[in-house]
Amino acid sequence: ETDGEQEMTRAFVFPGQGSQAVGMGGDLLATFPIARETLEEIDDALGRNLTKLIASGPPEELTLTENAQPALMAISMAVLRVIETEGNIDLSASCTFVAGHSLGEYSALAAARSLGLADTARLLNTRGQAMQKAVPVGEGGMAALLGAEMDVAQEIADEAAQGEVCSPANDNAPGQIVLSGAMSAI
C-alpha cells in the first residue's frame, strides 16, 4: 500500500501460436513509428522481410511454424514498445510479472529484457524451422477438446488413432485438452 491506497499489480501476457493472422498489427504499424522500427529491427536480425509476410501473406505462408513464431513475437514486441513509448513507461520495471502461453513465453522473456529482441527473433526463427522440419506440412495437426477430462481425452485419442499417432499433447486449462498427431487421426 502507498498512502492508504493499494498499489496496482501489473502483468503483461503474450499469446501463443495459432493467434496469427495476415494483417495483424496493421493499424499499429501504420500509426506508430516505434512499431515499424521494431519490425525493421527483427527483419534485419532475420535477414528477410517478415514485415511484408505479416502485412500481406499469403496466409498459408504466415501459418507455417517457421514464420508464425517470429511473426507473433514481432507483433507482441511492437505492441509492447508502443505501450511503453506512448504511455511513457518501462514495462520491464513497472510490471510485477510477464508471462506467455507456449510460444508467448519467448515474447515474455524479451519483454523482461532477459533476451534481446534480435536474439529472440533468431531463436524463434531457428525453433520454428526445426519444428517445421519435424513434421512435414499437412501431415500433423492439433485439435482442442473442450469440456473433456484427461481420461476422456485419452479414450478419444486412442479411438481416433487407428494405427496412427494421436495423443493428448497439452492440458491447456481446466476443460481444454489439446490432442496432436497425424492429421488423418485428428
Give each language-model segment a name.
Residues 72, 79, 108-110, 130:
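Hydrophobic side chains within alpha-helical segments
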Residues 73, 101, 168-171:
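Long, contiguous hydrophobic alpha-helical segments, chiefly transmembrane helices and signal peptides
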Residues 40-41, 74-78, 105, 118, ...:
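A broad detector of short, well-ordered amphipathic alpha-helices
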Residues 101-110, 114:
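Glycine-rich nucleophile elbow surrounding the catalytic serine of serine-hydrolase chemistry
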Residues 1-7:
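Short, Lys/Arg-enriched N-terminal segments with co-localized hydrophobic residues
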Residues 8-99, 179:
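Helix-rich "cap/lid" substructures immediately adjacent to catalytic or cofactor-binding pockets
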Residues 59-60, 96-99, 103, 128, ...:
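Short, glycine/charge-rich beta-strand/loop segments that flank catalytic centers
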Residues 17-19, 111-186:
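Alpha/beta catalytic cores of group-transfer enzymes, especially the acyltransferase/condensing modules
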